[in-house]
UniProtKB/Swiss-Prot annotation:
It is found in: Cytoplasm. Pathway: Cell wall biogenesis; peptidoglycan recycling. This is Beta-hexosaminidase. GO terms for molecular function: beta-N-acetylhexosaminidase activity. It comes from the Bacteria. Substrate binds at residues 57, 65, 128, 158-159. The keyword Ribonucleoprotein does not apply. The active site is at 171 (proton donor/acceptor), 242 (nucleophile).
Length: 334
């Protein structure tokens, strides 16, 4: 899964899309100008690769890639911080609204919800986390994911097994979490366990080193992805690497080495962003590899369902009522 430089496909990007190892596209703000432009971009992508998964980070708050023509969603922390139990209804509404608006421009899924438990020390997570207790995170994330599914969108929990306990930003460094496995199982992993039991469709591991548990970060660790996630937690959904161009991934070697290590550890799809040369290097490294039947099945479940015509969505009472509820919630949170 790779990204694009701008709002239109370049010749190199068309070539990347047609590569047999390319399976997904991740979109950013630089790729978006308007809903009509996004519909045209998605249509062009689908004309080249009808099976291409199209994703975006669209959590709400400071991580919302599309703004103009989309409802501004509150940060995850607002739902329970401001509104208490009533926030769960708002979280479900926001999950539906986010998913419905994205599906209406052809995007399959958003990398959401964030399942990290905020410990008050991670600025890169911060208000992206729903709460500071696993029970509250679970309740709010469950509501948000329920809304997503009502709009035909699968959910992806991140950042396994929990990014909220470290100060470092894995975009810039490899943070180290020195807690024992028992501590993570009793706190940070609880939201993941709960949503896995409710058939969570996807998970994204963190680029964090849990040094007292394993010598490798989860994206490159068979222990984390196979022994813990697949076997102990019985997760049968898709595993997406976090961005392999991040500084936190450099421990695994060059781009090709990172890709191969992530696949060997158990990732179903590799994500690489902001570095076209990394995309080219990884596609070359994967030239002769084919996805396993299990990965193919798990990734197929990430395809968006119930495609919504955008004009029909904006004319619907369900959309108007949802927008009004979120606007009122945003006003009350200020």
């Amino acid at each position: 899964m790779f990204d694009l430089v701008g709002p239109r496909l370049s010749a190199d990007e068309r070539e990347f899309l047609c590569h047999p190892a390319a399976g997904g596209l991740i979109l950013f703000s630089r790729n978006y100008a308007s809903p009509d432009q996004m519909l045209a971009l998605v249509s062009e992508v689908r004309s080249l690769r009808p099976d291409m998964l199209i994703a975006v980070d669209h959590e709400g708050g400071r991580v919302q890639r599309f703004r103009e023509g989309f409802t501004r969603l509150p940060p995850a922390s607002a739902y329970l911080e401001v509104a208490g139990e009533a926030g769960l209804a708002a979280a479900e509404t926001a999950g539906w609204l986010m998913a419905a608006e994205l599906r209406a421009v052809g995007v399959d899924f958003s990398f959401a919800p964030v399942l990290d438990v905020d410990s008050g020390i991670s600025t890169v997570i911060g208000d992206r986390a729903f709460a500071r207790t696993p029970e509250e995170v679970t309740a709010a994330a469950r509501a948000f994911a329920t809304g997503m599914r009502r709009a035909g969108m699968a959910a992806v929990g991140k950042h396994f097994p929990g990014h909220g306990g470290v100060a470092g930003d894995s975009h810039l460094v490899l943070p180290e979490d020195r807690r024992e496995l028992e501590e993570l199982l009793a706190r940070d992993l609880l939201p993941f366990s709960a949503l896995i039991r409710e058939n969570l469709e996807g998970i994204m591991p963190a680029h964090v080193l849990y040094s007292r548990i394993d010598a490798r970060p989860p994206c490159f660790s068979p222990f984390w992805l196979q022994t813990i996630l697949r076997e102990r937690m019985n997760f049968d959904g898709a595993i997406f690497s976090d961005d392999l161009s991040m500084a936190g991934a450099a421990v695994a070697g060059d781009y090709a080495a990172r890709a191969l290590a992530a696949l060997e550890a158990g990732c179903d799809m590799l994500v690489v962003c902001n570095t076209p040369e990394a995309t080219a290097s990884i596609l070359e490294a994967l030239e002769n590899r084919t996805a396993s039947p299990g990965s193919t099945r798990r990734l197929a479940a990430m395809c968006g369902r119930s495609r919504i015509d955008r004009d029909a969505l904006l004319a619907s009472s369900e959309w108007r009522n949802a927008v009004d509820r979120i606007h009122s919630f945003n006003d009350s949170a200020q």
